[in-house]
Amino acid sequence: AVDDMIEQLLPLLDDGDILIDGGNSHFPDTIRRTAYVESKGKLYIGTGVSGGEEGALKGPSMMPGGSPAAWESVKPIFQAICAKVEDGSPCCDWVGENGAGHFVKMVHNGIEYGDMQLICEAYQLMRDLLGMNDDEMHEVFAAWNKTELDSYLIEITRDILAYKDTDGQPIVEKILDTAGQKGTCLLYTSDAAD
């Protein structure tokens, strides 16, 4: 789909124009696309974008890579729309040429998947080995969220453990015990093995 879109856009672009891919492209594809688009006289930026729903509202974290000549043009735009840390610094900077932006995003996703697995295992141990109920586990995750473990994933786990359905029962007990994936974790583990 990305390659088809590039083919549709190239005839509409002038030399030196910048094409930006903000999807979860696999970094080898971004390397290939950068070379191809540059061979046509245009510039290509492959940008990892992170932040989900909150990022859409408050600004995402952005990880641009690709054609170095494009960075100075997109930098003020990207750094204006991205999330900011407490001191106002932008959550966006140039990460490197070719597929570097999508590579960093892939590693970011891999770390996030690892964190989610650790949370699942902690939950299972507390529930099945220690016999803790949802309220007790909520308290543990709330305490963890006040330490160096503070994170969005710990926060939402804490919150879901406290949430009750309309009948007063914990909603977590009604959630189907399955998980899906979009394939990005498979790419991460495959590239890590290589």
Locate the predicted segments by residue.
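Conserved short loop/turn motifs at secondary-structure junctions
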Residues: A143, I175-A179
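Rossmann-fold dinucleotide-binding core
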Residues: V2-I6, I20, H26-H138, K146-E173
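Short acidic alpha-helix initiation/capping motifs at coil-to-helix transition points
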Residues: G114-Q117, G180-L187
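Class I S-adenosylmethionine-dependent transferase superfamily signal
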Residues: L9
